[in-house]
Amino acid sequence: MGKKLSYLVFDCETATLSIANEIANGDAEKKKKIAIARPLIYDFAYVIIDRSGNILKKFQALITETFAVPQIFNTAYYANKRPIYLEMLKRGETRLMNWNEVMEEFSRDLETVNFVGAYNSAFDFKKAIPFTELYISKLYSAEYQGWEAVQRTICWSIANKPYKKNPEKEYNPNVFNFRGNEYPLFDVWGMACEHLINTVKYKNACLDGDMLSASGEFFKTSAETSFRYLTENYGFEEAHTALNDAEIEAQLLARMLKRHAVSVGIEPFPFRNLGTTVEFLEAQKNAKEERIRKVLNVMDERKKCYKEGTSYRRKLENYIERLINLL
């Protein structure tokens, strides 16, 4: 028999550059744009499992250069969890390590596994790890001040101008490029949308449990909602600490590996595979009025966020009309 396959499932919690708060100036949406484009990891964790879901290794550390720097950590969405981490440090449940120490262990483990991935590999492996790696390299160089000045200009544009994709930027959805090496990359989110949650039962659970996107157009497809469905524990909430979340995501992967081979590559917007809530309700012979009204109410409220005549408002108004016709 050949060597058993192994899978590294990664998760992280991120902050962003300290200049984000200044540039956003209290605008949460602007800060969010910067945080997504310029993530800095402060909580780094992964779980290595075999195809049966047996845990071969767990690793977790807090990054000294980000967690222990208030100007950085205070930009984090979950900055209020700092006391939780401090208690974990006191109890010996986590440790502070500098980035390059963590990367040494991470690099060794990457060489032992067959595949690497995360619930949102596009963010974790294509943005969070590469940008934190870049940040640390600049932090310990003589050119940091100049680099930060350039980032200030870039972050202002990110916050204040429409997004423009760089057509020249190389993007290979099938591999994680790290320190001169390539590793086959999977995406738990994409696999879940294909193999685990694209079911009538899941979609009805979303409608009954308020697990909808902010606009009501799509079903939620997060690790949290997927795990709720897997365990039938609809009160479950993710801890939003990296190791706990990686363990949950590893369980989701293991469930799918029982019937399917790992899918290499990142599919953009995998939630679209489930279709829209309106399409689903229209396909039902006798959709429950309660479910129709739930989506209707979410969309009716959301449309207020868009000006009259804008394309997305018109789209929501069209959906609303279709839902009214189902009543």
Task: Locate each region found by the language model.
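Conserved non-catalytic scaffold segment of RNase H-like nuclease domains
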Residues: 2-8, 12-129, 133
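Acidic carboxylate-rich catalytic motifs and surrounding loops in phosphoryl-/glycosyl-chemistry enzymes
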Residues: 60-63, 190-193, 234-244
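Conserved DEDDh/DEDDy metal-dependent 3′-5′ exonuclease domain
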Residues: 79-199
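Acidic, Mg2+-coordinating catalytic module of metal-dependent nucleases/exonucleases
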Residues: 115-122, 126-127, 131, 204-289
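Short amphipathic alpha-helical heptad-repeat segments
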Residues: 285-299
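Charged, low-complexity interaction regions
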Residues: 303-314
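Short, charge-rich amphipathic interface segments used for partner binding and complex assembly
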Residues: 315-326
